[in-house]
Amino acid sequence: MDGETAEEQGGPVPPPVAPGGPGLGGAPGGRREPKKYAVTDDYQLSKQVLGLGVNGKVLECFHRRTGQKCALKLLYDSPKARQEVDHHWQASGGPHIVCILDVYENMHHGKRCLLIIMECMEGGELFSRIQERGDQAFTEREAAEIMRDIGTAIQFLHSHNIAHRDVKPENLLYTSKEKDAVLKLTDFGFAKETTQNALQTPCYTPYYVAPEVLGPEKYDKSCDMWSLGVIMYILLCGFPPFYSNTGQAISPGMKRRIRLGQYGFPNPEWSEVSEDAKQLIRLLLKTDPTERLTITQFMNHPWINQSMVVPQTPLHTARVLQEDKDHWDEVKEEMTSALATMRVDYDQVKIKDLKTSNNRLLNKRRKKQAGSSSASQGCNNQ
């Protein structure tokens, strides 16, 4: 493409359809060579930004021959960029993983870059979809089915010795707006092979970061299991188990609560949630990574492998996400900015029971509820 990217061209650009998908799920070996000719020969690029990945922005594009809408991610060539492409290519074609359709190696402003063409996930983010349901109830059974799908993606990665290391809501996208849309995991910017004990780099998203990432301990696939616990927690109530009380992306207090496993299951949001679900969260959020469930154990847990018989209890999730929409967006922005600024804190991890947790969003909700209650009872409650 020699200097031209989606940032500079008008018109849409989707990736070409690759039968079966490359990588571990498609061609044996999982690695393919990037195409060296201009991406614009095959795709029409658009200025429409679809999202921001760890290492680069994602733009809309269209396959010239088929008209298929795709997503293009531009990475300036570096060992880190090559690693991201390698890991995503290896995983592409796996269940519930965004598929790579093509990769190009082009020059842009005199610099070599890699352009990843992926299937376009037009259904948006996981929690946005739940948030948009309005009065339609989101049930515990639906949460279990979603967790089973995410677990299926992680199981595929872990079975091929890849740790994703950045499993978070923004990286879980739906293929379309339709009811039968498929949820898929994307953005392999922090993914690493786990065969060489290499997972020691402090790059992560604070609200979904495992305790050992915040200290000197090595961490591996169990990081992804911790993230599954946090996502499952949010699915079942609408807010995260850990919060920064200072407004910073991650505060010393929040680090401490993550390290000590300080979270709770407060009412009314958790009053009707099954004990099976709470037990599974406890097993995922263990502060000692050696005690945390493996992905195989997670997939074999009754709440996951018998998700069709999980109670269809209506949850508070959709309402909470909608009511706290502004705060949720702010939290996501904080997480993004924190990726570049967080540093490892070498305090020792200690496990401690918690009687009460100080969750900023939850306290705000409780205060609001107390105000409504006191107004109806005619008493003034601070």
Curated annotation (Swiss-Prot):
Pfam families: Pkinase. Its EC number is 2.7.11.1. Residues 307-343 are annotated as: Autoinhibitory helix. It is found in: Nucleus; Cytoplasm. GO terms for biological process: intracellular signal transduction; macropinocytosis; MAPK cascade; response to cytokine; response to lipopolysaccharide; signal transduction; toll-like receptor signaling pathway; vascular endothelial growth factor receptor signaling pathway. Residues 20-29 have a biased composition (Gly residues). Phosphorylated and activated by MAPK1/ERK2 and MAPK3/ERK1. Phosphorylated and activated by MAP kinase p38-alpha/MAPK14 at Thr-201, Ser-251 and Thr-313. Residues 44-304 form the Protein kinase domain. The modification Phosphothreonine is found at residues 201, 313. A motif (Bipartite nuclear localization signal 1) lies at residues 350-353. ATP binds at residues 50-58, 73. Keywords: Acetylation, ATP-binding, Cytoplasm, Disease variant, Kinase, Nucleotide-binding, Nucleus, Phosphoprotein, Serine/threonine-protein kinase, Transferase. It is an enzyme of class 2 (transferase). Stress-activated serine/threonine-protein kinase involved in cytokines production, endocytosis, cell migration, chromatin remodeling and transcriptional regulation. Following stress, it is phosphorylated and activated by MAP kinase p38-alpha/MAPK14, leading to phosphorylation of substrates. Phosphorylates serine in the peptide sequence, Hyd-X-R-X(2)-S, where Hyd is a large hydrophobic residue. MAPKAPK2 and MAPKAPK3, share the same function and substrate specificity, but MAPKAPK3 kinase activity and level in protein expression are lower compared to MAPKAPK2. This is MAP kinase-activated protein kinase 3. It comes from Homo sapiens.
